[in-house]
Each structure stands twice: as C-alpha cells, then as structure tokens.
C-alpha cells in the first residue's frame, strides 16, 4: 500500500523545466532564463511564444530552437532538457558562435602571497631635501607694444613646458597685447635684439612685441623704469635699495641708525612688543609706492634737459630747416608780449573823474530846474497846450465850413493869419513866464539847445503852390 501511494503522489506533481536561451548571432547577449511549466506550457507553439516574450529579439518572433554547439534543430517540447542551453532564432539559419562563453566572467589566477615577513632595516639614505629642489615656476615677462610709450607694460606668465613651443608662446603674447598690425610675429629686447626661441626668454625682463612692421627703436627703458633695476637675475635680491628722497631716514647713514638702535636697546631693558604682520606689509607697500614715484621723477628729470632756453627750444637741428635763412625782425614786426612785460600806461583817472562829476552836477541842476518850473507854473504849462489845441480845433472848424460854403481864398487866408497870431501870442506868454525865473540859467546849462519850432498853419492851396514851386525848381 505504501508503494502505490508514493507512486500516485509522484505522478500527480507537475513537470517544471528551466532552460537558458540565447539570441541567434548575438555575441553580447548573455542569455535569458525561461521556466517551462507543464500546466502553462502545454505545446511547443506556446513555448515559442514564451521565448519570444522573454528574449525580445530584434528579428521578431522566435520560430526555431537550436542547440548551442552543433545547431541541431528541436521540433518537440519533449526534446528540451531541464537546465540546458538553447539558441532562439527566427526564419534565418543558425549562426555558429561560442554561445556558452558569452557573459562569463574570467577569473584571474590568485597570486601567491609571500607569507614571510622581513624585519625592518634602519639605514641612512641620503635623499635631497624637497625644499632644495627647484620649483617649476612659470616664466614671467613684461610686454610692450611696438612704438607705444604711453600704455604700461603687460605682465604675462608662460609655463615652463610651453617655452619649448615658440608658436604657442607668440599666440599667448598676441592674446595679451593687441597690435594695430594684427598678430605678434616677433619679440625683441629693449636694445633691439631678436628673440628666436623660448630658451632665450629671461624671467622678469621686458620685451617689445612686433607684428609685420619693423622694430621701432625708442627709449623704452628710460621712460618706463630705471635702468639700475632692469637687469637683475632671477632669484637674486637687490643688495641695497636707493634712499627715499625727502625722508628723515635717508639723511642719516646706516651706522648711525645701528648705533641708535643699540643705545635704545641698552636704555630700555624691557622687551618691545612685536608688531603685527599686516602693519609691516602696509609699511612695505608704502615704501614701494614711494620708490616708484621717485624713479618716475628721476626719469622725467633725465629726459628733460635743464637749460636756460627751456623745453621749447630744440636740442638738435632738424633736417627740414637745414640751410634755411633766418628772417630778421624789423620795425613793422608785431610781437605779442605778455601783460607783465608790457610798458606801463598812464591813465588820466583824475581828469576823467572831474568831467564825470561835472556832467552829473549839470544833470542834477537841470532836473532840479525843470522840477521848479513845473511846480511854479504847472497850471500855466498844462493850460498852454490845451489852449493851442482849442485854437487849432476852432480854426479847423472855421476853415471847413468856409470851404464848404464856397468862401474865397482871401477870407480863408485872413482867418489863418489870425490863428497864427493867436498861437504866437500864447507861445510868447509862455516863454516870458519861463524866462523870468530861469532864462539865464537855462542858457548857461545848455547853450547849444535848439530853439523850439514855431507852429504855423497853412491852407491846402498854399501847400499846392509850394509843391509846384519845388517841382519847377527841380526841373530847372
């Protein structure tokens, strides 16, 4: 009974197979594990569908299954063995590759480690100190454009490895300095010597960048910096700095300063406090700026000659003026002289002031006289023009109806004569009233005053006769 029950339980378990499937002709595909369950995969066609979904081959659906070594084609599901390797292909033929070695990690052989431990041997090995080795610092040069004495020099850092490539050095110089002629093709020293390779470049020196044009030999060194500090080899400090002009320290010698410091140290037994590093750097920066200013002043004094004729007199004769005759001055030559060199002129300020005072007094007297006249005979002065206007209006009114009514010219002339007589009487009265008080003063004040015009009324016929007489005279 027990044997039959074991057989029945064994037959009732489903059959499950696991295989590794590769792609046909793909040497980089490591394979895909596919599980074949008896209940789910009942036929070979269903197995092909499962492999198609698992492999996802670029050629499409899987139609054939091959063995990896010989390429034998499998046609039934029973031929597949659990744990085996197979190749899935489409309609194409089998491609023979070493599928079993795809994706396998090759293990390196283990190195034999020597288990013996040697004792430490103490020995003195002579090795040069690291600080003594020269550092590969970049080469620092200062560049000046050809013919440029105004702009300051530009600083350029060139790596040591780049010095062997001269074209690359010229390219770096072109990027640093812009020339009108274009790129930089040559480098010259300040003396005009051509630099042909990077090995000739010296650290901390000045060079002139030249393009396609020729080198312009100008006093670059005199105008930009002092010659004493120009040629100093790299890594060597200056032995002594020039004294600062105008400072108290430059007046005394170094021995005096040393003696003062020793005396001060003997007097004061207490130690002096240490100064901060920042203050020391500030003092050094101030000294450097003063030194630069002194160098510029010294260079400017060297370039400008100290002569009595000044800077406006040329030092040498020009080629254009060679052989030309000098034009001599004569009496007609006009020379502009400054104001402080002109002869003094005497100005009659007193006479002009007296004349101005007299004119002002005369004006004041005349204005006062007019004011008195207006106050005294204000009513008469205001009535006189009104009387004249009334007489004129009356005469016009009388003259118009006479003409209209057909009066004769003799009657009109008599009426005009009467009007003129009346006007003359009014003017005479006015003159007498004004001349009684200030007739003499007015004559003294303004002797050249023109007489007042007399008002005379003429008839239209007289005007026509006068016009005809003038025309006859013009024709004659």
From Swiss-Prot:
**Reported tissue expression:** Ubiquitously expressed. In brain, highly expressed in the entorhinal cortex, inferior temporal cortex, medial temporal cortex, hypothalamus, amygdala and hippocampus. Expressed in liver by cholangiocytes, the epithelial cells of the bile ducts (at protein level).
| Highest taxon in the source lineage | Eukaryota
Stretches of Low complexity bias are at 415-426
**One of the GO BP terms on file:** cilium assembly
Q: Where is this region: Disordered?
A: 234-476
Consequence of mutating residue 424 to P? Answer: In DFNB66; results in ciliary abnormalities including increased ciliary length
Localization, UniProt: Cell projection, Cilium; Cytoplasm, Cytoskeleton, Cilium axoneme; Cell projection, Kinocilium; Cytoplasm, Cytoskeleton
Asked whether the keyword Protease is assigned, the reply is no
Bias (Polar residues): 261-272, 296-306
CDD domains documented for this protein: DCX1_DCDC2, DCX2_DCDC2
Residues bearing Phosphoserine are: 270
| Major localisation | other
Ranges of residues in domain Doublecortin: 17-100, 139-221
One annotated GO molecular function is: kinesin binding
Gene Ontology cellular-component terms for this entry are: axoneme; cilium; cytoplasm; kinocilium; microtubule; microtubule organizing center
Q: Which disease is it linked to?
A: Dyslexia 2: A relatively common, complex cognitive disorder characterized by an impairment of reading performance despite adequate motivational, educational and intellectual opportunities. It is a multifactorial trait, with evidence for familial clustering and heritability. Nephronophthisis 19: A form of nephronophthisis, an autosomal recessive disorder characterized by chronic tubulointerstitial nephritis resulting in end-stage renal disease. NPHP19 patients also manifest hepatosplenomegaly, hepatic fibrosis, destruction of the bile ducts, focal bile ductal proliferation, ductal plate malformation, and cholestasis.
Q: How does it assemble?
A: Interacts with DVL1, DVL2 and DVL3.
Q: Please give the name of this protein.
A: Doublecortin domain-containing protein 2
